[in-house]
Structure formats: structure tokens, C-alpha cells
């Protein structure tokens, strides 16, 4: 699952990547291929040079035809540069404007890692005019693969089944499962999920869509509310279906076996699906406008994916069939009413079918207001904030990345609201729920800005969230470009600077469920770092030599390092100088 930052990086890199691909085609096996970009400069002498080698680990084997990307943090002042490694793995980029850059390397079938062979997302370089940075080493290692075959109870191939490779992440202070990769089986029942980093995963297979069952369910006669012959869970006709199955062979995610993948692994995971008694969810949609209907969707709270659905019958009843045990959110969306409406309800399916779920859709809310920016002249940025380049984002308080599981109330709702030049903004058709407001965008205030206050009816709601339950909510939002700054150097136990260390400002415990309160950066080749836009408050600074992904969002992970962090108190506009000792990574 790509983050917003990854998507932004992709869009930024697209022109450069296309140019590099053309260069590869033209240069073939030449020793060094170079493509440069960025703004024009009158004197080449003021430009920097970067060169190094790309190797495959273990063994330090040279990697040819790797795409090297050098991306400026500040696109207004720097540029984007690319090169392609030669047969000896070497690369050379020249004509680089001064600034702070991120350096990445990509090659099909390989992933970038640090010296401890933990997945890395590039490194940071700070380049001065005329500086030459040489002897860089970018390490790649083989990606892992999960492959296998899915068959039915007779051993026949099961085509179009969805196989997912899952990993555990933490969002909003709670565990969440996300897809690291997924593929559908082919006509032979075979699948192959590639490009996986070393780590711990779980593998699941979901049967192909049962369109026949869905059509039959939608066309079934509704049962009357006073029908005493209606089936109860113990009286329901015996039905069987294929269920989502976890490796090696269980429908209970809690009993799934973890799969530990190492670099270059080709792990075989075969499945044989057998029909088993299926559970269902029955209920009704009430209080609908005349002639309105609703679509029912079942969203997994573990995976934040819509897994199943049903159509509402004429009397408002619905049946969702073939439900596996688990934690869900059930959604009812009404889109053919004069005003979009929605209902959502959390439920747990254990060992029996669920009856009598009652959903009462409500109209979406209207959240609007005005954003103003304080301290523009005092901030660290290079000019006034361009309000039209600012976005505000609603994120549900319960930690769901997608409050609607990928579905919306018609065309009127989006999580993101663009701020107009006069500071006004609005969200239309907001589903019922409680939301945090987040700041995003590329205003001229730079990276030192932060969200200072969110008022609803004169009351501060930044900590509790904004409630939406139909009707209008007016917000007065204040941002500041005068966020705190923490800068310094990361050193090892011998006092030597450490490059590419991951520095994270972790907020106090009560705010750790809100990932936007964290601040993260990476030290450059001299061990220097700067954390920008820190909201006033209490923090703990950590510097890891190597850290797996975003493990620092996991409260259990942080418990292991409680005594190795440095306390930081920062006020608005304060600039703190800190010296951090790196937390060593595990030995190779």
C-alpha cells in the first residue's frame, strides 16, 4: 500500500524515470549512463558531483542497469537527477545544484537495504556548491517471492482466487494488516507474488467471487417482519462455501502460521480449499426516504478492505452470505436519495451467523470554515504561505486510513479539501463519525508549519476530533509557519558521525496514536539532521542506525528503547540543538 508521500514521489519522478528508461535503451551496456535534470545554473563550477557503485549483497557483486535517482527535498531550489549504473555497477551524476537530496536505486527483482540488510528507502546527501561526493555504496539484495497453487476439494485448479501476502502494521495506535503484495491465480490455479522484502508475513487466499450466489441473494424473496417461520441461526438451511483461508490451512487468522522470508527466498504456499459451513449477516435498513434503496458493504477492520456485499430487498432487509469469523464494519450507502446518506456499524462475527442488524442511514454532514496562518514573517520559510497550495485532510479517530473502506457517499465526499486563496475550505457529504484534521500541501511557508488550533463553535477540538452527524459544522483553523526545529549530529559510541540514521521525534504517550504528531528525518553523509515543523510539546528523540519500516509507530517496539531516547521540549518558534548517540543495528 503506497503512502501519500510515495505517491507524490512517483509523480515527481515520472518524467525523470521516463528519460532514464530511454537512456538505458540507447546506451545498452555502456559503462556509465548519465541523465541530469533540474534548474539551469550559469556556472558549472557551482554544481556538485555524486558518484559511487551499486552492489548486490551478500557478495558485493556489481549491479548494472540500476536506475539511480537523486531527488531534491526542496523542488523550488534543487532538481531531480538520474543515472544508470554501468557494467561495473558504477554511476556518476554531475551538474547538481546545492541542496539536500534523497538518493535512491532501483532494479527489477532487487530491493535497497542498509548495511544491516534491512529494507532502506534511500539515503540523504547534503551538497554544497562545487562539492564532490565519491565512493558511495548503494546496497541491493534479492527480493523474496511467495508462489504456489490453489485447488478445490477435488484437486482441480481454482482460477481467479485472490492470494494476498500480508504484514502487520500500526495505524492510530492499533494493529492493522496490510497487503505487501497480491495476485490472482491463473487458469492452472498458479500464482506468484514477487518483490517482497525480507520479513515476517502471513499468506491468505480468498475464493473467486461467487456471482451466482450474489444474484440469487439479490433476487430472493424478502421475509416479512412478522414471518414466524423465518430461519434463526440454528434453523438456517445448511449451506457451504469456500472461505478465506490462511496459510497453512485455517479460516481463523489467529491460527495462521507466520512465514519468515529471507532475501531471494522462493517460498511455496499451496492451498486446497474445501467448502465449509458458511455464516451470514442478516439485518435491515430503516428510515429511508421513499423509493430509496441502499447498497450494503462489509469491510474488514483488520485489513481495511471491502470483502463482501449485498443488495437491499424491497422491505429493507438484506443478507450478506459467506462471512468468515472476524471483526467488521458494515456500511449502508444510499445514493438515489435527494441527499447522499450513510450508516456504519462495527460488529464481530464469532461462531454463529449474526441476526437483526439495524442500519439507519443519515445524511452526510457539511464541514466548512476558514484557515488562517500566523507568524508568516517569523517563520523559517522563504516567503508567505500560498493558501491555495494547502490541503486539509480528515482522518477518522478510530484509526481507519479510509473511513469509508474505499467507498464514498456519492461524488460529494473526499477526505481532502483544498484551501481557497481566501482561506476558505469545505467537505461535503461527510459520513457520520469523528475526525481529526490534518495539514498537507506545499505552501510557501515550507516545512516549518504545523496545525496550531482547530475550533468548532469556539471550542478546541484538535484532541477530541470533529464530530459529523449530519448538519453543518463550522471550523476556525489556525496554522503557524513557526514550528519548532531540532537540529544536530548523530554519532556512534566512538563519537564518529553516523550517516543514514533514522531520527524520529516521538510525541508524549497520549498523542502516539496520531501519526501526524511524529516527526522523522534521516542524517546526511556527515551525520547532520534537521527536524522541521515540530508542534510545541514534549517529545523523545531516537536515532536508529537501522529500523524496519515504520516500526516506531508500534507502542511495543518503543518499549524496547525507552531509556535510549533523549527528551526534547520545544515551544513555538524554538530552535534546539541536540547531539544524539545512535542506537546500533543488529550485526549482519
Where do the model's predicted regions map?
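N-terminal secretory signal peptides that target proteins for export/translocation
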Residues: 1-14
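Long luminal/extracellular ectodomains of secretory-pathway precursor proteins
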Residues: 2-5, 21-22, 26-588
